[in-house]
């Protein structure tokens, strides 16, 4: 299926504050001067949940390289976790987790967590704002892009979005951001392709002031446009409400409401997914990781600010995973964490550490290939303030992996979205993208002559037929073939369906 080209004109986001009982929502769209409709490219019910750790997480005190402990104790003795407190991981003695991350340890030991070591990008930027934009857009460090990698993905799957949406075939928002702010990650060529939601109670009621007709002036056109976006958001709000109302019971594993903001967000995400919302991507966040000072307690390095943050992250993900199982949707959801950069190897005199390069990230879910990808960073015996954890994997390879092995896109589409080719990594079970064995329709009688055989067609897929005892006359590569049987002996017909 080929993509169409659309003429677009970009309009700013329309902000609709405080309109849904504790939730604020933002709707984003383009002025619909030209609209085009086309079926979505890839049929999938899979969901990707992204957890943003704002501030730059200290990877060395998160995934602890025990085999480098002697040199680490010299480089960061005032913040390093005591080796006896580090949580061991099944299958390795060289690496452990922060003692606050018992939930993640349990998930890792059950094969539901992949740790990817040393994630960054070439020539990293140490500015929070610039680095966050790089992760959001998947740009090179010397580029400035105005579209996000997921915005480009959404534009590929739903061309022209958000113009012409919602509609009968796509009634739900494609992406949902829990929290406030403008999500550059979801910026598509035609506008922001996400709805932003914040709050702790689900939707109740909506009113739009549209009784008076808009005047025929430029201001009236702007008012009419704003109303159209409000109506779009109203439609999405109704869908969110319906999905939320479909789920009345969830896992009791979550922390008490209000004590862990990340867990509160993930609980709503699970509720919406289980309730039938067809959104493909959710973005949630946890802040506070810019630990230049006071990272640990001065008397016990296993507790303190960073420990509290990692404890919340771990507890939230574990509760979320428990809930996905409870709601019977675990095989549909994969999650990943990211932070704009890591921290320096050496600590500072303020009980913290400064902006650095690479750090590990977590991929979690029932369909991940558990374990550790990459090696522990090598810590020199003498560490200076200029020494960093080196990059092993480009973060964009993880994005490309999610597009290929989770969302099942072909390589041409991935390269288009990522703007250049990136290798993929063994993170998610690629078998998730193998189509089910098709059921062949056709005569099973032994006879001489021609017979037709077919399977249900999937747009963009190819079909390789194998016939024993007969000859394919036409249709090889398609979902239907005609076969010439030249004898009355038994034969076989089989087919392999392949994605592009």
Whereabouts are the PLM-identified features?
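Feature for exported/extracytoplasmic and membrane-associated proteins, marking the mature portion
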Residues: 1-314, 319-327, 346, 360-433
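Hydrophobic alpha-helical bundle architecture
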Residues: 323-331, 335-354, 362
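Proline-enriched interdomain boundary motifs that mark the N-terminal boundary
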Residues: 434-442
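A short beta-strand segment in extracellular, disulfide-stabilized domains
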Residues: 448-457
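Solvent-exposed loop segments of extracellular immunoglobulin-like
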Residues: 457-464
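Short beta-strand segments within Ig-like beta-sandwich modules, predominantly Fibronectin type-III
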Residues: 472-477
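Solvent-exposed segments in extracellular or luminal domains encompassing
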Residues: 479-490
């Amino acid at each position: 299926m080929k993509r169409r080209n659309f003429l677009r004109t970009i309009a700013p986001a329309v902000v609709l504050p405080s309109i849904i009982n504790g939730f604020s929502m933002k709707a984003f769209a383009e002025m619909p001067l030209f609209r085009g409709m086309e079926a979505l490219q890839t049929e999938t019910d899979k969901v990707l949940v992204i957890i943003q750790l704002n501030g730059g997480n200290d990877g060395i005190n998160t995934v602890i390289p025990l085999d480098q402990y002697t040199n680490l104790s010299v480089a960061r003795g005032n913040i390093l976790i005591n080796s006896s407190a580090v949580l061991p991981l099944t299958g390795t003695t060289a690496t452990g987790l922060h003692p606050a991350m018992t939930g993640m340890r349990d998930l890792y030991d059950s094969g539901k967590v992949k740790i990817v070591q040393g994630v960054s990008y070439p020539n990293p930027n140490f500015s929070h704002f610039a680095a966050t934009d790089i992760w959001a857009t998947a740009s090179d460090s010397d580029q400035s892009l105005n579209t996000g990698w997921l915005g480009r993905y959404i534009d590929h799957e739903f061309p022209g979005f958000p113009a012409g949406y919602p509609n009968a075939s796509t009634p739900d928002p494609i992406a949902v951001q829990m929290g406030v702010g403008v999500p550059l990650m979801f910026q598509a060529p035609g506008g922001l392709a996400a709805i932003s939601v914040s709050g702790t109670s689900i939707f109740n009621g909506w009113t739009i002031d549209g009784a008076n007709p808009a005047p025929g002036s430029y201001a009236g056109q702007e008012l009419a446009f704003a109303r159209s976006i409000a109506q779009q958001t109203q439609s999405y709000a109704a869908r969110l409400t319906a999905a939320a109302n479909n789920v009345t019971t969830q896992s009791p594993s979550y922390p008490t409401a209000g004590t862990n903001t990340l867990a509160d967000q993930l609980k709503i995400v699970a509720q919406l997914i289980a309730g039938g919302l067809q959104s493909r991507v959710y973005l949630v966040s946890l802040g506070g990781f810019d630990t230049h000072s006071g990272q640990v307690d001065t008397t016990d390095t296993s507790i303190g600010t960073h420990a509290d943050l990692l404890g919340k992250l771990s507890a939230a993900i574990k509760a979320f995973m428990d809930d996905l199982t409870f709601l019977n949707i675990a095989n549909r959801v994969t999650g990943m964490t990211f932070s704009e950069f890591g921290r320096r190897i050496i600590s500072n005199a303020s009980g913290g550490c400064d902006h650095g390069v690479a750090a590990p990230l977590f991929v979690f879910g029932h369909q991940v290939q558990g374990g550790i990808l990459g090696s522990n960073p090598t810590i020199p015996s003498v560490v200076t303030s200029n020494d960093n954890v080196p990059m092993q994997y480009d973060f964009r390879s993880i994005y490309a992996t999610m597009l290929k092995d989770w969302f099942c896109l072909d390589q041409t589409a991935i390269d288009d979205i990522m703007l250049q080719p990136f290798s993929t990594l063994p993170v998610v079970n690629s078998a998730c993208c193998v189509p089910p064995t098709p059921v062949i329709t056709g005569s099973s009688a032994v006879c001489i002559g021609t017979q037709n055989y077919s399977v249900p067609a999937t747009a963009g897929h190819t079909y390789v037929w194998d016939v024993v005892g007969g000859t394919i006359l036409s249709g090889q590569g398609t979902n239907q073939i005609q076969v010439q049987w030249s004898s009355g002996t038994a034969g076989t017909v089989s087919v392999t369906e392949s994605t592009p």
